């Protein structure tokens, strides 16, 4: 009933709009047609100049149309027009809010909304929907909650599309309970978009079971299941890894009659791949009447994740036979799997196919190639690919530095890291970059370089070291017989020392049998109130390695006891 009314209203709206446009002057009609064909700001500005020359810039309808088209192409140009309009109306304000909501400056929509309220114009639901879109993009919880309150007091919450926008806003901002509250307050005015939005919100916070419960509620309601809702449903099944659930979901798609939709076919292939039904995924793929590159990529990716790399290569050749042009995404997952399994032959075959297809070497694909070649032992090829890359991101640099380190070329790894800092101001090293450099220094015995890198990580980039970073530094100094230097380094860090660093050092003391330093570290942990029974056992082991069995026993008995673990079996 609701759908029929909505459809009738939409037809009436289109009919009235066409009637309205037919009543416009030929000059105005030509203006609208010209604006529809505009592709850039230059063309819009020419029409704007024509309007000023002919006096159409005083016509509210013509100016509204100019704003509507220019706000999509260039919001700043639209803003310059809007600022000079003396008689702004609600449509113009909504147009500007919408323009900002899809621009690079979504936060400016808030000031336009405030201007709209200050002018005293009557708001409509689109004023809220477009402003909420900006709130979602900027994660502005307080502003979004304020809009919710205004909409509630103004009586706009009866509109389903506004409620859907609110649910989306709360989901994006991680306030899933508030999103559910809005949903529960609208039992009679929900549609498929409402269910899909909230289901996606549950999936974002890893609450797959609640997403499935919501789908069951939808099935019991009068709301018709659509492709978007089914995609969310299949995603939840995939994340749960339930093969029997996947088969039931597949049957449901067939019953509803949407199993031939290309998006659903791709989702079904991915679902079966993730739930262990790779043969079922292949059957769906083979039976698909129509396939696009995304469908091919999905099947190849599922084979790659399952370790069936030869099947991936066969599919790549089949793509070429069927004249389906692959893209960079076709190769990325497969190359990563080759790197993980150290499958050099398959990796080179894939790389050769990539060369044949002349796929552009972007940052993601280039990084996958560098990583694959480095991990299968072909470092020279990795360097060649890295040097060919025009666009390199932090992952590209990190992959190449890691490759040097894995091949024992610590000096080259440090040199490349320094080059990254010097030549690429836009590329900022991350915690993983520092970890691979520290690891290379540790295995290469570059003590000074490693310490300098660690200090830069903390002092220049303000990263908080993790246990892996501390482990590399302690191992680096330990291999050089400089555990005391490691002690001083941790003690003098410009950040508040935590137990992670001291425990890494305590473990190193046990390896190298430095009992005195181990006692000092234990005292530090005690001063911090971070002692644990396992620390006493580590110290006991340190004394044992140092040849002090008495102290080893004393430490274990008196300084701490570790509770015994146990297993339990419940018997009915």
UniProtKB/Swiss-Prot annotation:
Keywords associated with the record: Mitochondrion, Repeat, Transit peptide
Annotated transmembrane regions: none
Keyword Repeat among UniProt keywords: yes
Gene Ontology CC entries for this record: mitochondrion
Record-linked InterPro entries: Pentatricopeptide_rpt (IPR002885), PPR_At4g14850-like_plant (IPR046960), TPR-like_helical_dom_sf (IPR011990)
GO molecular function: RNA binding
Transit peptide feature range: 1-117
Gene Ontology terms describing biological process: RNA modification
Major subcellular site: mitochondrion
Protein name listed in UniProt: Pentatricopeptide repeat-containing protein At1g26900, mitochondrial
């Amino acid at each position: 009933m609701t759908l029929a009314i909505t459809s009738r209203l939409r037809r009436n709206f289109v009919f009235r709009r066409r009637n309205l446009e037919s009543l416009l002057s030929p000059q105005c009609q030509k203006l609208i047609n010209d604006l529809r064909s505009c592709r850039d700001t230059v063309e819009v500005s020419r029409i704007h100049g024509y309007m000023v020359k002919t006096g159409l810039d005083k016509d509210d309808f013509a100016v509204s149309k100019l704003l509507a088209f220019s706000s999509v192409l260039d919001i700043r140009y639209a803003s310059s027009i809007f600022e000079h309009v003396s008689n702004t109306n609600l449509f113009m304000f909504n147009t500007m809010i919408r323009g900002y909501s899809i621009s690079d400056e979504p936060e400016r929509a808030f000031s336009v909304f405030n201007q709209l309220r200050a002018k005293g114009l009557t708001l409509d639901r689109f004023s809220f929907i477009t402003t909420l879109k900006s709130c979602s993009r900027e994660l502005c919880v307080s502003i979004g909650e304020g809009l919710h309150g205004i909409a509630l007091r103004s009586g706009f919450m009866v509109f389903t599309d506004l409620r859907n926008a609110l649910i989306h806003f709360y989901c994006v901002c991680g306030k899933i309970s508030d999103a559910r509250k809005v949903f529960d307050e609208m039992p009679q005015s929900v549609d498929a978009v409402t269910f899909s939005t909230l289901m996606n919100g549950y999936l974002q916070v890893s609450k797959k079971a609640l997403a499935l419960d919501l789908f069951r509620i939808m099935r019991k309601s009068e709301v018709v299941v659509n492709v978007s809702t089914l995609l969310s449903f299949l995603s939840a099944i995939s994340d749960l890894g339930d093969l029997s659930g996947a088969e039931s979901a597949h049957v449901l798609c067939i019953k509803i009659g949407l199993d031939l939709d290309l998006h659903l076919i791709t989702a079904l292939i991915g679902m079966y791949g993730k739930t262990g039904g790779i043969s079922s995924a292949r059957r769906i793929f083979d039976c698909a009447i129509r396939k696009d590159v995304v469908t091919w990529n999905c099947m190849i990716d599922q084979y790659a994740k399952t370790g069936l790399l030869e099947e991936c290569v066969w599919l790549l050749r089949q793509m070429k036979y069927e004249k389906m042009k692959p893209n960079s995404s076709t190769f990325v997952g497969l190359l990563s799997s080759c790197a993980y399994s150290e499958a050099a032959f398959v990796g080179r075959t894939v790389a050769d196919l990539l060369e044949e297809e002349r796929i552009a070497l972007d940052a993601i694909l280039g990084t996958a190639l560098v990583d694959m070649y480095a991990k299968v032992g072909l470092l020279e090829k990795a360097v060649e690919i890295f040097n060919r890359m025009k666009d390199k991101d932090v992952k590209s640099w990190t992959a190449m530095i890691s490759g040097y380190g894995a091949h024992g070329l610590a000096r080259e790894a440090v040199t490349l890291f320094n080059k990254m800092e010097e030549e690429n101001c836009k590329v900022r090293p991350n915690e993983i970059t520092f970890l691979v450099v520290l690891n290379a220094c540790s295995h290469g015995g570059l003590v000074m370089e490693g310490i300098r890198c660690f200090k830069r990580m903390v002092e220049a980039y303000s990263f908080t070291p993790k246990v892996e970073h501390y482990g590399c530094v302690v191992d680096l100094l330990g291999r050089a017989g400089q555990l005391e230097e490691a002690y001083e380094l941790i003690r003098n860090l410009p950040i508040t020392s935590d137990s992670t660093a001291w425990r890494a050092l305590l473990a190193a003391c046990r390896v190298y049998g430095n009992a005195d330093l181990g006692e000092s570290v234990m005292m530090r942990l005690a001063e911090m109130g971070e002692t644990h029974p396992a620390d006493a056992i580590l110290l006991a082991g340190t004394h044992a390695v140092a040849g002090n069995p008495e102290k080893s026993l004393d430490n274990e008995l008196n300084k701490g006891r570790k509770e015994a673990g146990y297993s339990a079996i419940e018997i009915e």
